[in-house]
Amino acid sequence: NRFTRRELTEQEVYVFTVVLCDNDIDRDYERFTPGALEQLAQLYVGKTGIFDHDPKSSGQTARIYAAWVDTAPGETTQVGEAYQRLMARAYLPRTKENQALIEQLDAGIKKEVSVGCAVGSVTCSVCGTPRKEGCAHQKGYRPSGGPALLRPLARRAGKK
């Protein structure tokens, strides 16, 4: 009830857990550092969930009320690090309009999310050069005998 305008009962809200992002390499050959995940955990509390990256208030559906970094036992990333993910607890009101969404969440149909944030810097994981300055390493290049992915870019959460 920290983010509501009035006290809501358990029967009035649907609560669920979602994985927001992790420290593994994504489709853009980037990844969050464990430190960035910790920063994002603090930043996402109180933020709303929207559909299709549409920032209109009419698209706001759920609100995050808790976030934390979870280490998955026995799982590793493509670069061999312990797999960590940013988890969140969110709620949405149990309304007639939200009933179909609640059913899709329960059935596991709606479960993937995409997060948005501003980052302070993006650096090459091989040489540490800031992305804006450029370096000789090609994003996603796999050298023979080298690591699974040479150049995932490390993201660091920063101010907008």
Can you say where each PLM-predicted feature lies in the sequence?
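Signature of dsDNA virion morphogenesis modules
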Residues: 1-160
